[in-house]
Amino acid sequence: MKHIPRKRFGQHFLSDQGIIDAIVRAIAPEPGQPMVEIGPGLAALTQPLVERLGRLTVVELDRDLAARLRQHGQLDVIESDVLKVDFAQVAQALNASKIRVVGNLPYNISTPILFHLLAHVRVIADQHFMLQKEVIDRMVAAPATSAYGRLSVMLQWRYAMENVLFVPPESFDPPPRVDSAVVRMVPHEAPEALSMPVLEELVQVAFSQRRKLLRHTLGRWLEARQFAGTFDTQRRAEEVPVSEYVALAQECS
């Protein structure tokens, strides 16, 4: 029986074989590698991955799809909302210090998923995700550009990232109304040590009114914390490089 894509799950199934092959080449799975796929859907990417890996863990929220996937002998199925999955526990279950994570992420909750994985980054070797191209543009954006924002700072602090593949709407069934792309995310081996909640709060405050000078937003936040250091607040949030936000978070942690 044909599966009807569920709008509430943001389901758009990959159907272009050429694109699927290109994604698998970008991921470059090796036999025995511990890997988790988020949102396997109709297994378009799952099948070529598991053929190369031998075994694959998948996270699927849709109960009908999860039931189908369980019939595949080489898949371990976690039927759950990915935002509730403890990836450290998954790594432990796979006897792995680090796992690889891949997926065609639901576009309506892609940012929360990225932040959820950021909290588990210590057990992640790398990530390859299909996302809305506009989201990837924000992830990899440089300072002083309109795409540079909270997502850019939080993810660039912890990952080296690159856009590895453009994916047009007609590669999906049903086609989304936006262009897509695949991003590669490799955690930095020795990231700057800091309090992640402090960096998160600091960056959120800084970009809360991005057109205003930082003295109106971050300046007040620093005053409230009785910050005694020096930080130029006569700039807009988008003009401050990641390294300066990180250094400030370290001073405030």
UniProtKB/Swiss-Prot annotation:
It comes from the Bacteria. Its EC number is 2.1.1.182. The keyword Nucleotidyltransferase does not apply. It is found in: Cytoplasm. GO terms for molecular function: 16S rRNA (adenine(1518)-N(6)/adenine(1519)-N(6))-dimethyltransferase activity; RNA binding. The gene is rsmA. Disulfide bonds: none annotated. InterPro entries: KsgA/Erm (IPR001737), rRNA_Ade_diMease-like_C (IPR023165), rRNA_Ade_Mease_Trfase_CS (IPR020596), rRNA_Ade_methylase_Trfase_N (IPR020598), rRNA_adenine_dimethylase (IPR011530), SAM-dependent_MTases_sf (IPR029063). Transmembrane segments: none annotated. The keyword Endoplasmic reticulum does not apply. Keywords: Cytoplasm, Methyltransferase, RNA-binding, rRNA processing, S-adenosyl-L-methionine, Transferase. It catalyses: adenosine(1518)/adenosine(1519) in 16S rRNA + 4 S-adenosyl-L-methionine = N(6)-dimethyladenosine(1518)/N(6)-dimethyladenosine(1519) in 16S rRNA + 4 S-adenosyl-L-homocysteine + 4 H(+). This is Ribosomal RNA small subunit methyltransferase A. S-adenosyl-L-methionine binds at H12, L14, G39, E60, D81, N104. PANTHER family: DIMETHYLADENOSINE TRANSFERASE, DIMETHYLADENOSINE TRANSFERASE-RELATED. Specifically dimethylates two adjacent adenosines (A1518 and A1519) in the loop of a conserved hairpin near the 3'-end of 16S rRNA in the 30S particle. May play a critical role in biogenesis of 30S subunits. PROSITE patterns: RRNA_A_DIMETH, SAM_RNA_A_N6_MT.
